[in-house]
Design a protein with these regions (language model features):
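S-adenosylmethionine
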Residues: 1-259
Length: 259
């Protein structure tokens, strides 16, 4: 995670003080961890160290697949970034492994938020797998009305807006909407924003294209979000599946005939 060490330590100590949970011990422990973090990176986990819910869900995997999973898990993920256009990528002054004419993996991703090009809104961070579906939409008529049903934090929406297309951004979460607005401001992009539950959308408005990046378990992003392993219970897969099915059904009523 890209948080400054001193900020993590100070924040943790302040919380410990409020909860009366040994702030002195927490302060000393975190400082020691920060000092020896390179040694900690050498520690390898076994599959049996992972939460029981995850082991059960992956019981179908072969020994080779589990071994491969652990090898990938221990690798630090590179940050994938997407540019507004080809010219901005050409002017980029850092090492980049290109994945398209407007995107690539940062090979030196330390403190990427401090780069002038990031501050100026030339690009945004977006997982490669999230980037691909919209990248394939090369030829979309500018008269098409597009709805991004679960827009925040905005990666897919930014791809569409960068092509000067008409897209309405929706998200159920007020907190995520705020993140979306912050990102739009930095990127100097604008769009109509809705804060609704997509399943409750009425049938009055119709759309030519509906993008659904539905809520999911996030298990596929474990390398970037290892905190998933620290939850007492795993994701409620049945509940998530039901939600995804309901969202797809809702979309079928909101799409134009040729959508």
């Amino acid at each position: 995670l890209n948080f400054k060490e001193y900020a993590v330590i100070n924040c943790s100590v302040e919380i410990a003080k409020k909860l009366n949970l040994y702030p002195g011990i927490i302060n000393a422990t975190l400082k020691k961890i920060a000092k020896n973090k390179n040694d900690l990176k050498q520690i390898k986990i076994n599959f049996s160290d992972l939460p029981l819910w995850f082991q059960k869900k992956t019981s179908f995997m072969s020994y080779y697949e589990k071994k491969q999973f652990l090898e990938n898990f221990h690798k630090e993920p590179n940050i994938h970034i997407v540019f507004k256009d080809e010219e901005k990528l050409k002017k980029f002054d850092a090492k980049l492994f290109k994945t398209s004419m407007i995107s690539g993996f940062l090979l030196d991703d330390k403190n990427f938020q401090d780069r002038i090009s990031f501050i100026n809104g030339d690009w945004w961070v977006q997982d490669f797998s999230s980037f691909l579906p919209l990248y394939s939409f090369n030829k979309i008529n500018k008269n098409k009305v597009i709805l991004d049903a679960c827009a925040a934090p905005g990666g897919k929406s930014f791809q569409i807006l960068s092509k000067k297309l008409n897209v309405i951004l929706n998200d159920k979460s007020k907190n995520r909407i705020q993140t979306l607005k912050t990102n739009l401001k930095r990127l100097k992009l604008s769009a109509k924003i809705l804060n609704k539950d997509f399943i409750q959308f009425d049938n009055k408005s119709k759309y030519d294209i509906i993008i659904i990046d539905a809520p999911c378990s996030a298990v596929g992003t474990i390398r970037r979000n290892p905190e998933i392993f620290f939850k007492n219970k795993g994701p409620n897969f049945d509940k998530l599946l039901s939600l995804q099915e309901n969202m797809l059904e809702r979309a079928s009523f909101l799409l134009n005939t040729s959508g």
